């Protein structure tokens, strides 16, 4: 992770927003529109998430960044009156296809929420539960999967002697890492983080950020955050959204040091948001 100094002035040249990732695309969004009933919440979104990179989504509350994140695994299908139009391609297959197997999609695209949500069961069962939904494996194979997931979430050394303890007995930061372990145990390809550190203390936040930096070696990651410094630290690409529109998208260093749009500049310097 690198520190980026936030710019205080906007260059006179105003090139168009970029829509290409800094590598092969894992997820490609084409002319995406989203509606809550009659409310046009997302408007003509075009962007791509690079494989094994971290893409940050920033913008004021209500701008549509969390809505966009929930489209990537079709969570909006859980609520009536919501619909998406356009294309969201995961390895060139449109996940908006109504015939798509949503269980398979949500195995491929995992999600970690703002508030830690461990299940009211043991640490071991928190990890094993999701695996059992998709696979039938032996006890020894499950033991190995649980250990690997907990190691992947940098939690194994803290819980290896109390796997039968309740997941709810862990600290807030540990619970969030347990949720990350639960997500990676089903072997996703993409992980979505929706404000994963907003309820955590600075020490726990630092651990999650270090973990995200490690996880991108195996997974494509998208993170929604209100923390500008966090976006600058953990991501390679950043998308700034405002009022349901993608205002600017490009390399994180450029977005934070020489943004092309005045609205981006005003937001990252705290003039609104």
From Swiss-Prot:
Catalysed reaction(s) here are:
phosphate(out) + ATP + H2O = ADP + 2 phosphate(in) + H(+)
Report which superkingdom the organism of origin falls in. Answer: Bacteria
What keywords sit in the KW lines?
A: ATP-binding, Cell inner membrane, Cell membrane, Membrane, Nucleotide-binding, Phosphate transport, Translocase, Transport
Keyword Cell inner membrane attributed: yes
Q: Can you tell me where the transmembrane regions are?
A: none
What topology does the record note for this protein and the membrane? Peripheral membrane protein
List positions binding ATP. Answer: 59-66
Give one GO molecular function term.
Answer: ATP binding
CDD domains, alphabetically?
ABC_PstB_phosphate_transporter
| Claim: Nucleotide-binding is one of the keywords in the record | yes
GO biological process terms on file = phosphate ion transmembrane transport
What does the subunit comment say? The complex is composed of two ATP-binding proteins (PstB), two transmembrane proteins (PstC and PstA) and a solute-binding protein (PstS).
Q: Which family does it belong to?
A: Belongs to the ABC transporter superfamily. Phosphate importer (TC 3.A.1.7) family.
Under the heading PANTHER family, the entry gives: ABC TRANSPORTER I FAMILY MEMBER 17, PHOSPHATE IMPORT ATP-BINDING PROTEIN PSTB
Give the function comment from the record: Part of the ABC transporter complex PstSACB involved in phosphate import. Responsible for energy coupling to the transport system.
Entry protein name? Phosphate import ATP-binding protein PstB
């Amino acid at each position: 992770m690198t520190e980026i100094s936030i710019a205080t002035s906007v260059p006179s040249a105003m090139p168009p927003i970029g829509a290409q990732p800094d590598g092969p695309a894992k997820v490609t969004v084409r002319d995406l529109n989203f509606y809550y009933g009659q409310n046009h919440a997302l408007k003509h979104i075009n962007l791509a998430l690079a494989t094994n990179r971290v893409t940050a989504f920033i913008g004021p509350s209500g701008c549509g960044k969390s809505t966009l994140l929930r489209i990537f695994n079709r969570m909006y299908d859980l609520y009536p009156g919501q619909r998406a139009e356009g294309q969201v391609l995961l390895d060139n297959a449109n996940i908006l296809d109504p015939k798509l197997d949503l269980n398979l999609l949500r195995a491929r695209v995992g999600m970690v929420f703002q508030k830690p949500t461990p299940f009211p069961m043991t640490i071991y069962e928190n990890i094993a539960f999701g695996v059992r939904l998709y696979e039938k494996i032996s006890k020894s194979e499950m033991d190995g999967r649980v250990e690997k997931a907990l190691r992947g979430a940098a939690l194994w050394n803290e819980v290896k002697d109390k796997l039968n303890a309740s997941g709810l007995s862990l600290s807030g930061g540990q619970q969030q890492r347990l949720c990350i372990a639960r997500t990676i145990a089903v072997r996703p390809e993409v992980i979505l983080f929706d404000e994963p550190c907003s309820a955590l203390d600075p020490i726990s936040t630092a651990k999650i950020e270090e973990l995200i930096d490690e996880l991108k070696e195996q997974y494509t990651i998208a993170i929604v955050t209100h923390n500008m410094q966090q976006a600058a630290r953990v991501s390679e690409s950043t998308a700034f959204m405002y009022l349901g529109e993608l205002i600017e998208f490009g390399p994180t260093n450029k977005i934070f040091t020489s943004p092309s749009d005045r609205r981006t500049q005003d937001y990252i310097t705290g003039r609104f948001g």
